[in-house]
Amino acid sequence: MSLMTKLGFRALVASCLITAGSAANAQVNVLITGVGSTQFPIATANFTNEANLPQQVTSIVRADLARSGKFTNIDAGSTPVPETASVDLGAWKAKGANAFVAGSVNREANGQYKVNFILYDTVKQQSLGGLSLTATDTTLRTAGHKIADYIYQKLLGVRGVFATRLSYVIKTGNRYQLQISDSDGQNARIALSSTEPIISPAWSPSGTKVAYVSFERKKPIVYIHDLPTGRRYMVSDQKGNNSAPAWSPDSNTLAVALSLTGNTQIYTVNANGGGLRRLTQSSSIDTEPFYSPDGRWIYFTSDRGGAPQIYRMPAQGESAGAAQRVTFTGSYNTSPRVSPDGKLLAYISRTGGGFKLYVQDLQTGAANAITNTNRDESPSFAANGQYLLYATQSGGRNVLAAVPSDGSAPPQILSVQGGSVREPSWGPFMQ
């Protein structure tokens, strides 16, 4: 959300319901609107014994690869091919596939499934290995995502993010839902349902907790939701606004924006709610903190120069070193997010009356808009740094979009039927 929107919310009387683990009726749907300029052709044969499964693993693998914009699926026919089969790699190369995947799904005596697959390089005529995964009826989708991750890393040299998760807020009528889903928007679960706004979800580095801001008590308060247990607890309920939680890389601390003394300033608080410490000491508005991946710096938005810009200070606060301005392209920049490798800064810039997602090289300072949308907000990097998830508008609706962080392909739109979806946060690699 915009800087002033996040700071200016007034809460009303709320009624919240924790519903950890309950399935979501409204799920995010992915519309693939564009692909990269260079795609890797791959054929994924049907796995043996998967025809009657609750989830067909190969369908998930193919969909993941297509959704990445990095692959094109070559028709592998309808005949299942197990990982133990002798494969004519030259024939698959002749069909246009530079890689081929074969596999099987076998039900074991305990009711679980054993999912095996092998990946071949048809150009070099060699095996690239495979995995043997254990799954249940409810985790077959995860197995498919893990296979796609393996393929992505072996063929492109970068770890895949298909087995990661998303968090976002869906608004339907007068109800808000904080949902957790697979990276493709499927398998969505409701973490929190409320008649009052929920904003700023932020994943812990471990992927087991989500911090967020709820307005259920007539003011913005920061909570942490523990996903494995469904338990949540209050982290910051200071006087005034409590907003914009951001995790430290070690998961022990949250940076937050508080209006405790008047103007909003940056503080840190222990993940258990104690140890409050003020980091900025300005007479301006300082908000939207975000840690660098090495934990040395906190990036934040401040209007100390007259208009919102991105600044950086030592993680110990301005007492350890003066804040330095980072963004110089554009006169109004907010919502800093640093890539997992620490090399890129994503932010929202007001341009031509709209708001666009920009990415800046932190070494050179070069910054470029990477979207063709014009109402962008809330950027979030994928765990491998190759994609950005953000909120925008499309066809008059509030939607999410995913775009390569280098801007090499158009955004893919993620929408929800009958509602609006905002406040995205892309989770870390699963442990």
Curated annotation (Swiss-Prot):
GO terms for cellular component: periplasmic space. One of its GO terms (biological process) is protein import. InterPro entries: 6-blade_b-propeller_TolB-like, PD40, Tol-Pal_TolB, TolB_N. It is found in: Periplasm. The keyword Cell cycle applies. Keywords: Cell cycle, Cell division, Periplasm, Signal. It comes from the Bacteria. Residues 1-26 form the signal peptide. Residues 406-431 are annotated as: Disordered. The keyword Cytoplasm does not apply. Its main location: periplasm. Part of the Tol-Pal system, which plays a role in outer membrane invagination during cell division and is important for maintaining outer membrane integrity. NCBIfam families: propeller_TolB. PANTHER family: PROTEIN TOLB, PROTEIN TOLB HOMOLOG. The Tol-Pal system is composed of five core proteins: the inner membrane proteins TolA, TolQ and TolR, the periplasmic protein TolB and the outer membrane protein Pal. They form a network linking the inner and outer membranes and the peptidoglycan layer. Belongs to the TolB family. HAMAP family: TolB. This is Tol-Pal system protein TolB. It comes from Burkholderia cenocepacia (strain ATCC BAA-245 / DSM 16553 / LMG 16656 / NCTC 13227 / J2315 / CF5610).
